[in-house]
């Protein structure tokens, strides 16, 4: 039967060492004993990370040699909390995209159109993070572009061809690989038409960008300058066919929920008029009723929406979801800060009510999960400033009062822990 030795256990004359990293039992939290060997908790965690990475790389393939939607969503679940429907739509879309490419190479008679995706959801609900996570688990070139930096060709700003250049760079200038890649265009709501009425001035960063994106999203041979920047006649271009590139667009679309709610209202006047109560539903609930016509009213041109046939809406995050985001994912914020404190040989502990108060603050700020890090930084700033110069601190405890700003974090010193241990003995 294996025995487990704590980091404080054992006689000083018989110090035990990890058989893998060589650290002594006093340098680690736990040392697990087996037949003639020992392994520490740090090596166990390292082994678990290696196994997870191997499982990720050896995802079960379907008959077409493409990762199955179930396997894609399984990996997404490790990093992204909630948003089940959006994750399902993304995993199916990515699976179908590459199945379509495999099918096209086998049969030239039937041509399957690609289904680009539009992600709609409030700020901080995970749109960008979903796309970033997809990039890590899908072995194809991937790039992210910010729609706010794009302008119509001939004006100051980035050309839409620069998006393809970034994809080409992520593929190490392998044109064949780049032509099977994924492009995520963020902040696409910021290129909406500035006005419903035609104007005598050109809208070079709004409707003009939408028009410029149409061809590369549908499929065209783009001439990409290998060094980037503006084109000039003496420059050689790389030809990239965008027909098989999957485009995912995302945006917060602030105010879109009001357009959707107004569509369902019936206006009437007079004594018999129906008085409709104010829509008290959360933004995410209203967005479930999204129709393409709502995006047209918001300011996207019909041709642009037509290139994005798959609409996926994301929920705004409630208190419980934010608490899960803080503590549960593989790279959760709490785990990141605990790792930072471990570098100072200090254990960082959060009370449950402290996590709940952090989530409440993020909801009040209306920044979703994006606001969690700034709240954590503010809470831990003084502690991280003082800790490197303090001696003997073994644990820092964060309570609800600390999050509210009415108390300071509790510092627990090593000598007090020893006193408690002696008293209990």
From Swiss-Prot:
The UniProt record lists the keyword ATP-binding: yes
Chain residues that bind Zn(2+): 18, 21, 40, 43
Domain ClpX-type ZB: start-end pairs: 6-59
Short name of any one Pfam family annotated for the protein: ClpB_D2-small
Any single GO CC term annotated in Swiss-Prot or TrEMBL for this entry: HslUV protease complex
Cross-referenced PANTHER family: ATP-DEPENDENT CLP PROTEASE ATP-BINDING SUBUNIT CLPX-LIKE, MITOCHONDRIAL, ATP-DEPENDENT CLP PROTEASE ATP-BINDING SUBUNIT CLPX-LIKE, MITOCHONDRIAL-RELATED
Biological role stated in the UniProt entry: ATP-dependent specificity component of the Clp protease. It directs the protease to specific substrates. Can perform chaperone functions in the absence of ClpP.
Protein name per UniProt: ATP-dependent Clp protease ATP-binding subunit ClpX
